[in-house]
A protein has these predicted regions:
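Short hydrophobic alpha-helices and adjacent helix-cap/hinge residues
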Residues: 23-312
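N-terminal secretory signal peptides that target proteins for export/translocation
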Residues: 1-4
Length: 312
């Protein structure tokens, strides 16, 4: 074999090994608030998406916040950090990581509160896929399912009330009125709910732990059913419990979108601003719909909302 040809082959092998080493060094740490099904489902999707891009399973490590902090103390060298859930994000942000951070599985208000409480400006190496849907999309769903509705009812809690002006703008820009009540304490929940239901055609649920929780949702839904005021919820579990519809992103949708942001971080590209889910699903409670004289199809509603979002 000519010497020049041998040198060329050796150079090719060297480049190949260098590329392999670069991929193997592309470590991704996924920090889960806890090792429960919801967080693990999204972590599995992210892992599968990154493996399709060429990373191997050993390049991706799952941690709880405590485990990640121990790894950092031992000289952790992740190229990108993914946080799943509010507690994981808070713990990681508190350590001021140098690596790019992709946060997921927390609503926008929770994300912004944690950044605000950290005392830092939003770092340029930080982005997120929010858990909740944008207000405009939710109000558009209200108009699709209830074209004759005039007023949208909303219950605010201590955490969600910071979004009041944003939702009000989304509602009013679509030609609807808004009736809202701020629940300052648990004792005032049902008085606030009654005042909202008395003046509204639909109840738009906005996540807030003081308003919507496992201990309150059954009675809230019972009150809406008796008043014949449907709820547009943010979780499919609420549809099973008696809400008319819910709009939400699935673990697969959130995981795939987060993985796309991780890829940007691994490539050294600038991360985009925090974003809402691009994709979503809608669930319909057929029994509640029939009781209200409505004929709703989840797939048709989803397609119409997606089409509306793509229009200029």
């Amino acid at each position: 074999m000519p010497l020049t040809r041998l040198v060329q082959l050796l150079l090719l092998w060297a480049c190949a090994w260098a590329s392999l080493g670069e991929v193997r060094a592309s470590t991704v740490a996924i920090v889960l608030t806890e090792r429960s099904a919801g967080y693990l489902d999204v972590a599995k999707v992210i892992t599968a998406e990154l493996e399709r891009e060429g990373l191997v399973n050993s390049d991706i490590t799952l941690y709880t916040p405590g485990e990640w902090m121990n790894a950092e103390a031992s000289g952790g060298n992740q190229k990108v950090l993914v946080t799943l859930g509010a507690d994981a994000f808070k713990q990681v942000l508190g350590h001021e990581p140098r690596a790019p951070v992709v946060a997921a599985l927390l609503p926008r208000i929770g994300f912004e509160r944690i950044v605000r409480e950290s005392g830092r400006r939003l770092p340029t190496n930080l982005t997120a896929v929010f858990l909740d849907q944008p207000f405009g999309r939710r109000v558009d769903l209200v108009r699709l399912i209830l074209p004759d509705a005039k007023r949208v009812g909303v219950l605010w809690g201590p955490e969600s009330v910071v979004s009041q002006s944003s939702l009000t703008q989304s509602v009013q820009s679509r030609g609807l009125g808004i009736e809202s009540s701020v629940v300052a304490s648990p004792a005032g929940l049902f008085a606030g709910l009654k005042s909202v239901l008395d003046e509204s055609d639909v109840l738009l649920a906005v996540p807030d732990p003081q308003v919507y929780s496992s201990t309150t949702i059954a009675n809230i839904l019972l009150a809406t059913y008796r008043a014949r005021i449907p709820m547009v919820a943010f979780s499919p579990a609420y549809v099973k419990a008696g809400a008319l519809v819910a709009i939400y992103a699935t673990p697969v949708q959130i995981g795939q979108q987060a993985a796309g942001l991780v890829r940007l971080g691994l490539q050294g590209a600038a991360l985009p601003p925090p974003q809402y889910p691009n994709e979503f699903e809608i669930s319909v409670n057929a029994h509640v719909a029939r009781s209200l004289g409505l004929n709703l199809d989840a797939r048709t509603l989803t397609e119409k909302l997606l089409s509306a979002a793509k229009r200029p």
